[in-house]
């Protein structure tokens, strides 16, 4: 069953949910929902009264008590059904993942290189640090990092996307997930987890975990609902002596019906379903949330930290121009830049090699045959390069190269500073190339801002969310791209420490921060952020630090995550407003019916002109039960979300759900009363 094509009311899920709803009638399950526990007690009490009346042990209308008791039990069942259906949908999504887990064998290499001798071992015996070889047609047996090779991988079993992806050693696409299939070529993989700790295992365990923990907002709302329930319970309890003193005591059955109709049973019955459905909708967007708390936090986020590359821009920066320093030939710069990039497997590094080949017919050379040493890029050094024949060639950010030159006793030329500024003002990224302490020139890397991204940021700004672009570019380049994209602020020349400091700064101001990351160097910031979306293609450290994982590895998904979180909070708030507004109409139905015989003046409140006291009370109880069923689709799908300001959103929801909560019960109760009367049931 596809996670993305799961129908709202799948017949098998509905049947299973009905069974679970009956199982949840036990006191232990009901106690977890205090509002519905009161309804459960009322159902039990009215059932006992009905039996006593039917046996003649107690005076009264046994048929009326049976009808009230039956519909109270139906109310509890409907609330159980809503929760069970939401849980069933999540479990069905998890079951689709279980099919991915297969008992398979793996080729465990004795040495960490392609062509080494291999032993055939069961996949579930692989340990962290083991090296395995997978070839076309094989299922990847474990989560890990590609250390050699490149291949096309079908990840549809995990992500639901049919298009294959490229996984290769080096760069940002080295992470692989157990359960995915190799379509072509081969990979040498180092396992990064032990059995039972794979990403797939954690996904299944997370959805099928023993008991979903309530989020802080959910707990706060539950406390409010309990307080309202206690108030209405005390108010209802005081009505019996008033009616008895008036000479016409109201029956316990009527008082229980009144209590159930007054307490917020609608939101009480749907609250758990809303929380479960929020995580389910996140999974439908191919994002795995570790808890409901993470989904809820996404709805409260007011600062988004967005990586420039891949989120704001298309992410395929390409070398577009070699700009030599004064006194340096362009070919000399191109040759040095290509040498520094020969072992650089990033798209930028490869584009430099290709540009040098196109401009000056400089062919690629093998690093090993040159007896050269490649110096990889690190977040701390912010440069990479090569050591060859006593030549030390580096390429990197302006500041990093400036420090490198000065540390080696050289001087950074003023004309190169001017060229860097010129490239940056055009919105391109300048990389400076140096040999020893001599600066050779600048490489311009061009990227393109995504279409429509400026409008999306404008919508976020309207919602009160601040957008901050994170980039390793210098301030001039960052400022040019930030202005073009329409973000509110930017952090240039970003390091892991700078990102962490920025998050803490915003949190100290009372803001909630969301960010994405995929590298080990992102882990500290991901761990600090309130909403941290790790990319599935990222490192194991990033996935463990985040509280969400995006299976599509799409950094732009962060905006959708915020939308889903806000939709969950709006759904909870809207249905709470609707539930409390409901009470007003039910008050006008039951109070006159219950007490008009004692206080005839209350007949003035019977504005719906209901047929009789019994039909009025029964109609209100029936409506109270049925409204839960009618609102289940809204609880599971969420209310319609529009990017509006907080005040505009509040006004909109008050009109729709506040006014709707007042009017719908008047209409519903009147229609039910007419049907009961026409059918002669009262």
UniProtKB/Swiss-Prot annotation:
Q: How does it sit in the membrane?
A: Multi-pass membrane protein
Which residues of the sequence carry a binding annotation for ATP? Answer: 344, 348, 377-384, 395
Q: Does the keyword Endoplasmic reticulum apply?
A: no
Q: Cite the entry's keywords alphabetically.
A: ATP-binding, Cell inner membrane, Cell membrane, Ion transport, Magnesium, Membrane, Metal-binding, Nucleotide-binding, Phosphoprotein, Potassium, Potassium transport, Translocase, Transmembrane, Transmembrane helix, Transport
Q: List the molecular function annotations (GO) for this entry.
A: ATP binding; ATP hydrolysis activity; magnesium ion binding; P-type potassium transmembrane transporter activity
Which reactions appear under catalytic activity for this entry?
K(+)(out) + ATP + H2O = K(+)(in) + ADP + phosphate + H(+)
Q: What is its EC number?
A: 7.2.2.6
User: Where, per UniProt, does this protein localize?
Assistant: Cell inner membrane
Gene Ontology annotations for the cellular component aspect, listed alphabetically: plasma membrane
Xref: InterPro entries:
ATPase_P-typ_cyto_dom_N, ATPase_P-typ_P_site, ATPase_P-typ_TM_dom_sf, ATPase_P-typ_transduc_dom_A_sf, HAD-like_sf, HAD_sf, P-type_ATPase_bsu_IA, P_typ_ATPase
Question: Which residue windows are transmembrane per the record?
Answer: 34-54, 62-82, 219-239, 254-274, 588-608, 616-636, 656-676
SUPFAM superfamilies the record matches:
Calcium ATPase, transduction domain A, Calcium ATPase, transmembrane domain M, HAD-like, Metal cation-transporting ATPase, ATP-binding domain N
Where along the chain is the active site annotated?
A: 307 (4-aspartylphosphate intermediate)
Q: Where does Mg(2+) bind?
A: 518, 522
Q: Does the keyword Zinc apply?
A: no
Q: Sorted alphabetically, which NCBIfam families does this protein's record hold?
A: ATPase_P-type, kdpB
**Role:** Part of the high-affinity ATP-driven potassium transport (or Kdp) system, which catalyzes the hydrolysis of ATP coupled with the electrogenic transport of potassium into the cytoplasm. This subunit is responsible for energy coupling to the transport system and for the release of the potassium ions to the cytoplasm.
Q: How does it assemble?
A: The system is composed of three essential subunits: KdpA, KdpB and KdpC.
Tell me what this protein is called: Potassium-transporting ATPase ATP-binding subunit
């Amino acid at each position: 069953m596809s996670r993305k094509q799961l129908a709202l009311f799948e017949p098998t899920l509905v049947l299973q949910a009905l069974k679970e709803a009956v199982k949840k009638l036990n006191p232990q399950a009901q106690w977890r929902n205090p509002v519905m526990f009161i309804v459960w007690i009322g159902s039990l009490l009215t059932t006992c009264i009905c039996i006593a009346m039917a046996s003649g042990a107690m005076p009264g209308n046994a048929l009326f008590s049976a009808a009230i008791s039956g519909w109270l039990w139906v109310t509890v069942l409907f609330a159980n059904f809503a929760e069970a259906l939401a849980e069933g949908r999540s479990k069905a999504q998890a079951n689709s993942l279980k099919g991915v887990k297969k008992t398979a064998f793996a080729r465990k290499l004795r040495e960490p290189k392609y062509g080494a001798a291999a032993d055939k071992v069961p996949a579930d015996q692989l340990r962290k640090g083991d090296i395995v070889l997978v070839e076309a047609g094989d299922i990847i047996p474990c989560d890990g990092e590609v250390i050699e090779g490149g291949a096309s991988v079908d990840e549809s079993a995990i992500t639901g996307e049919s298009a294959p992806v490229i996984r290769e050693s080096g760069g940002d696409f080295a992470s692989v997930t157990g359960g995915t299939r190799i379509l072509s070529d081969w990979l040498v993989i180092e396992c990064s987890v032990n059995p039972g700790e794979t990403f797939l295992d954690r996904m299944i365990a997370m959805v099928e975990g023993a008991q979903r923990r309530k989020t802080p907002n959910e707990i706060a709302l539950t406390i409010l609902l309990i307080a309202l329930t206690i108030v209405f319970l005390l108010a209802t309890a005081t009505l019996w002596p008033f009616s008895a003193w008036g000479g016409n005591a109201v029956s316990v059955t009527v008082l229980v019906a009144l209590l159930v109709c007054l307490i917020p049973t609608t939101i009480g019955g749907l609250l758990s379903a809303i929380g479960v459905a929020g995580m389910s909708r996140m999974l439908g967007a191919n994002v795995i949330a570790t808890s409901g708390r993470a989904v809820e936090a996404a709805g409260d986020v007011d600062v988004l930290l967005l990586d420039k590359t891949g989120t704001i821009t298309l992410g395929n920066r390409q070398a577009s121009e070699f700009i030599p320093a004064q006194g340096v030939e362009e070919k000399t710069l191109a040759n040095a830049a290509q040498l520094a990039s020969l072992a650089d497997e990033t798209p930028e590094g490869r584009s430099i090699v290709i540009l040098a080949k196109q401009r000056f017919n400089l062919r690629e050379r093998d690093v090993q045959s040159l007896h050269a040493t490649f110096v990889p890029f690190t977040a701390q050094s912010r440069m990479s390069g090569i050591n060859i024949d006593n030549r030390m060639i580096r390429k990197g950010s302006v500041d990093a190269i400036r420090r490198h030159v000065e540390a080696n006793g050289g001087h950074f030329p003023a004309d190169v500073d001017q060229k860097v500024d010129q490239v940056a003002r055009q919105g391109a990224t300048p990389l400076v190339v140096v040999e020893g302490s001599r600066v050779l020139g600048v490489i311009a890397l061009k990227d393109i801002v995504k279409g429509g991204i400026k409008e999306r940021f404008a919508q976020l700004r309207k919602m009160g969310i601040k957008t901050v672009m994170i980039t390793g570019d210098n301030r001039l380049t960052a400022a040019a791209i930030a202005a073009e994209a329409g973000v509110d602020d930017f952090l240039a020349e970003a390091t892991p420490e700078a990102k962490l400091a920025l998050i803490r700064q915003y949190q100290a101001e009372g803001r909630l921060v969301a960010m994405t990351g995929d590298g080990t160097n992102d882990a500290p910031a991901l761990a600090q952020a309130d909403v941290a979306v790790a990319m599935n293609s990222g490192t194991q450290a990033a996935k463990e630090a985040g509280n969400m994982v995006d299976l599509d590895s799409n950094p732009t998904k962060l905006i959708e995550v915020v939308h889903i979180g806000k939709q969950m909070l709006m759904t909870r708030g809207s249905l709470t407003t609707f539930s409390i507004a409901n009470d007003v109409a039910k008050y006008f139905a039951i109070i006159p019916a219950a007490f008009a015989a004692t206080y005839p003046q209350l007949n003035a409140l019977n504005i719906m002109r209901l047929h009789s006291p019994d039909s009025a009370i029964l109609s209100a109880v029936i409506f109270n039960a049925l409204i839960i069923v009618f609102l289940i689709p809204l609880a599971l799908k969420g209310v319609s979300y529009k990017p509006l300001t907080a005040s505009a959103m509040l006004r909109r929801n008050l009109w729709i759900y506040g006014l709707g909560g007042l009017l719908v019960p008047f209409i519903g109760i009147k229609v039910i009363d007419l049907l009961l009367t026409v059918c002669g049931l009262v």
